[in-house]
């Protein structure tokens, strides 16, 4: 399960970094494919044991990548900006279990971030587990991750 958690964290980090990329960076469909693949792998890992579980991870990753790519293709720069601002606000000041929503009035895309458990890591930083859900073109995608508060006050996805 640790491997799958790392996959999800890497995918979320790539998604958040995508918001900072210029024209030469990964496109929104690539980001969606990465997120979907990681989410599918996590879901697939819940089925079977041993080799059967590995097959579940592979199939889940493939199906998630296809769906995630389609959803990612529908996210624009404003969607990513709104998602990132909402993530920062939710992680900083929202009680565990309470969702904070974002909505792009121009295209109807929306999502929400739900911070969960708060803890301190081995270096003393405050960290939070969270769930992030986006609905793009009527299709929902959900991801799980951990983020830690940096000295500058911003939250950063960690692995």
Curated annotation (Swiss-Prot):
Q: How is the protein disposed in the membrane?
A: Lipid-anchor
Quote a single Gene Ontology cellular component term.
cell outer membrane
Lipid addition (N-palmitoyl cysteine) is recorded at 20
- TM spans (from-to): none
Per UniProt, subcellular location reads as:
Cell outer membrane
UniProt signal peptide: 1-19
Q: Principal place where this protein is found? A: membrane
**Covalent lipid sites (S-diacylglycerol cysteine):** 20
UniProt keyword Membrane, yes or no: yes
Family note: Belongs to the rickettsiale 17 kDa surface antigen family.
Identify this protein by name.
17 kDa surface antigen
């Amino acid at each position: 399960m640790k491997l799958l958690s790392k996959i999800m964290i890497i995918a979320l980090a790539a998604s958040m970094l995508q918001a900072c990329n210029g024209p030469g960076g990964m496109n929104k469909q690539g980001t969606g494919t990465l997120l979907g693949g990681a989410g599918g792998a996590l879901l697939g890992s819940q089925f079977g044991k041993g080799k059967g579980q590995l097959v579940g991870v592979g199939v889940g990753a493939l199906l998630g990548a296809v769906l995630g790519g389609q959803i990612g293709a529908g996210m624009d720069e404003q969607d990513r900006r709104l998602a990132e601002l909402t993530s920062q606000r939710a992680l900083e000041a929202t009680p565990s279990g309470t969702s904070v929503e974002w909505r792009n009035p121009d295209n109807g895309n929306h999502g929400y971030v739900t911070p969960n458990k708060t803890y301190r890591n081995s270096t003393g930083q405050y960290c939070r587990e969270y769930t992030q859900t986006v609905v793009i073109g009527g299709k929902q995608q959900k991801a799980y991750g951990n983020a830690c508060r940096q000295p500058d006050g911003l939250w950063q996805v960690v692995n």
